[in-house]
Design a protein with these regions (language model features):
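Active-site donor-binding segments of glycosyltransferases and PAPS-dependent sulfotransferases
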Residues: 54, 58-60, 64
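Hydrophobic/aromatic residues located in beta-strands of well-ordered beta-sheets
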Residues: 32, 113-115
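Short secondary-structure capping/turn micro-motifs that flank functional sites
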Residues: 41-42, 96
Length: 115
């Protein structure tokens, strides 16, 4: 399977769990795509079936904080379409799950289904 994993790439528990899950799935032959703003700290070197897609937060002067959720949504749509992902595994409800939900709606409007 081609699996996208959305996570915080830091040393926190959820980020470690998601990274280790992806690495274990890669060992079993799955193609893993980590989608986040920085390479996960526990990822180490990329392998032939492990990819990292950087989400670059835009700097928009109107907002006090960068609109990460919207940028992540756009990146998820792009990665699902161009890498032909089978599934997204998403850690954290906000902003990751809400971004994944928006991406799913956009993809469905284009005839692309992802669970």
């Amino acid at each position: 399977m081609k699996i996208g994993i959305v996570l915080y790439p830091t040393f926190g528990g959820s980020g470690i769990v998601a990274t280790e899950l992806g690495k274990a799935l890669a060992v079993k032959g799955h193609e893993i795509h980590f989608i986040t703003y920085s390479q996960p700290v526990k990822l180490g070197e990329l392998r032939k079936n492990v990819f990292y897609h950087e989400v670059v937060p835009s700097d928009y002067p109107l907002f006090e904080y960068t609109p990460y959720e919207q940028v992540l949504t756009s990146k998820l749509v792009d990665v699902v379409k161009y890498e032909k992902l089978d599934v997204l595994h998403v850690h954290y409800a906000i902003p990751h799950a809400s971004a994944a939900y928006m991406a799913k709606q956009i993809l469905q409007s284009q005839g692309i289904k992802i669970p």
